[in-house]
């Protein structure tokens, strides 16, 4: 019985040594991956602002397939006369289309200077007329504030987070990410 007990203690020591080694390796690995995550987050800020807008839009829009008609690629809304198909669109074509749309919206909001890219990114998601107004839709508080020269627009910007009349958590997260990435103080 004494030898069996000694063997059991030895096995437990070996097991504990292996377990401690495994925990040490896991904690070092987790620390390294967290640091890489931080570097990855910092890396996006090293990109030019337009590239940040493209990456952010792709991340939140996701890929649109045939079931998302009339949206294709990274969220482009097919306009009358356009002949895009979600079935045949490549990632490269969708990327080019996203960039073309963002440039078009930047031009639409160029009078707002350094806020034009932020507004273009918002317009890509909600439509330019939700911001600028037209017919039955009044001009947004965000645009009225910018026209008055007030650039303290965080609250007005993140207010664009409703879907079917209700606040949507993912849209709020998207607005906060866009603002953090694209707002120029």
Regions found by a protein language model. Give the residues of each.
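Short, Lys/Arg-enriched N-terminal segments with co-localized hydrophobic residues
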Residues: 1-11
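Intrinsic disorder/low-complexity segments in short proteins, especially the signal peptide
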Residues: 10, 27-28
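Bacterial N-terminal signal peptides
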Residues: 17-24
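Early exported N-terminus immediately downstream of N-terminal targeting peptides
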Residues: 69-72, 76
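Short N-proximal segments of mature Sec-exported proteins
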Residues: 116-130
């Amino acid at each position: 019985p004494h030898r069996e007990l000694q063997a059991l203690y030895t096995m437990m020591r070996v097991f504990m040594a292996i377990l401690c080694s495994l925990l040490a390796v896991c904690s070092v690995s987790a620390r390294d991956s967290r640091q890489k995550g931080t570097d990855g987050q910092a890396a996006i800020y090293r990109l030019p602002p337009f590239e940040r807008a493209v990456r952010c839009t792709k991340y939140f829009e996701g890929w649109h397939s045939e079931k998302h008609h009339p949206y294709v690629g990274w969220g482009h809304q097919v306009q009358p006369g356009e002949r895009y198909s979600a079935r045949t669109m490549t990632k490269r074509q969708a990327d080019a289309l996203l960039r073309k749309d963002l440039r078009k919206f930047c031009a639409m909001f160029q009078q707002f200077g350094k806020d034009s890219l932020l507004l273009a990114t918002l317009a890509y998601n909600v439509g330019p007329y939700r911001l600028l107004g037209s017919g039955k839709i009044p001009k947004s508080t965000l645009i009225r504030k910018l026209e008055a020269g007030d650039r303290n627009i965080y609250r007005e910007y993140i207010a664009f987070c409703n879907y079917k009349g209700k606040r949507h958590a993912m849209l709020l997260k998207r607005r906060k990410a866009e603002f953090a990435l694209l707002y120029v103080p």
